[in-house]
Amino acid sequence: MIRAFLVFPYLYILVQSNGYTGGIMVQLNDYILNHIAKTPLILSRYNKEKKRFDYDILKEKVDKYIENDKKELILLYGLRGLGKTTLLSQIYHYARLKIEPNRVLYFSMDELKLNDIKLMDALKAYSEIFGINLYEEKIILLLDEIQYERHWDLVLKNLYDTTNIFIIATGSSALKLRESPDLARRALHKPIYPMTFREYLYLTKNIKIESLFEEVILNNNLDNFKKVYAKVYSQILEEDVKKYLRIGSLPFALEDDELEVYNKIYTMLERIIYKDVREVKEFDMETLDKAFKLLYLLANPKGERYSYESLANTLEIAKGTLINLVDVLEKCELLFKIYPYGSMDKKVRKSQKIKFLPVPIKTALWHKMGVVIDDVCYGSLLEDVVAFYLYLFCKKKGYSLSYEPKKGGADFILISPYMEKIVIEVGLGKKSSKQVLKSMERVKASKGIIIGDELKVEGNILYIPWKGFLLLI
């Protein structure tokens, strides 16, 4: 005989009305009790004293829920190794100080899957054990690696629609690609990116400064920046800056030595290539092996523009397969592309700049290849970090990013939603304004920026030291 129990509206669990199922329910209750008891200890190792800037955003959301009953469904997604589990742990320990501890739940969804437990079953058992009404009472639910739950998007949608639970769920960068449109309208999507130098300084030196990117880059206002620049660089060493360029944008670089960081990055790449990529698009093993070779080619410190034809020939794969592979690596947020400035035809025909979103991937691959990091390498890393900063700014403010494909053309062109253009040139030494002025004339830009060694404004050109630019976002 089969009996149906209503758990949430439109969601049913079928259980057999015999002693065997009763035994399973007892085992589930035992599991939930044991899990809740051991969670504080398990998460304590992730509960770092220093917190990423994203923590403050999540903490504010939790406070609004506790104080004003403003529930939310927040999806944190991003590349492996960026500290999503640490953020959940920090929010878990904070929330337990604000409401009854047993109303803060954390589940690692891969562990539930390993134990063949569905999230809805776990919540039903929790509700029965503690006598808590899921529909009305305040509960904070933290879910790590939500993609391990089958039909996770529908489960979260129904939880959000039918209960009073505040939910934060984490997942890989590919997570957003597979959610239903209904959930997309309900959830707040919060991407977790690699760290900027400003965040790195806060976590390593306890130096906290505000972002001055718009004030400096868009408005040429250097008054506050000059004070910040002088103050910061009186407290740190040149090696601090170079270490950030090499490995500092990844949170685990804060605690591990450099060799261990490179090993962790390589392990992370293996998981992304052979696991995450296959969740987005099915490739055979030979193609996935070629993906690794592709990363090595893209890490060339002297190369930055790539044609699909030359890459496909080198890798001995079809051009279409290569395009699909790069597209998936971009969706996994391992890479991002910068298109040439100009017409749609030019964007398609001309080579793209392909950058690593976490710049330390490049140095980890250099380490594997035995590359000694010299000034040329640091120049390559600097341009990649500048590209990463501009990428972040474009994501937040709706700008777009291009480069000028001709020889001697601008490294970057920042384009506002109103089609105002800023030409940007990057280098470690003193740079002349001649090249920038020519690029400005060609693309009809209103402003130019030279990231080098100087700090001044001459006409419509801003000169900013590269070490100062790193402080802006």
UniProtKB/Swiss-Prot annotation:
Keyword Signal on entry: yes
Pfam families: AAA_14 (PF13173), DUF4143 (PF13635)
Domain of life: Archaea
Signal peptide (UniProt feature, chain positions): 1-19
Molecular functions (GO terms): ATP hydrolysis activity
UniProt KW keywords: Signal
Protein's recorded name: Uncharacterized protein MJ1637
Species per Swiss-Prot/TrEMBL record: Methanocaldococcus jannaschii (strain ATCC 43067 / DSM 2661 / JAL-1 / JCM 10045 / NBRC 100440) (Methanococcus jannaschii)
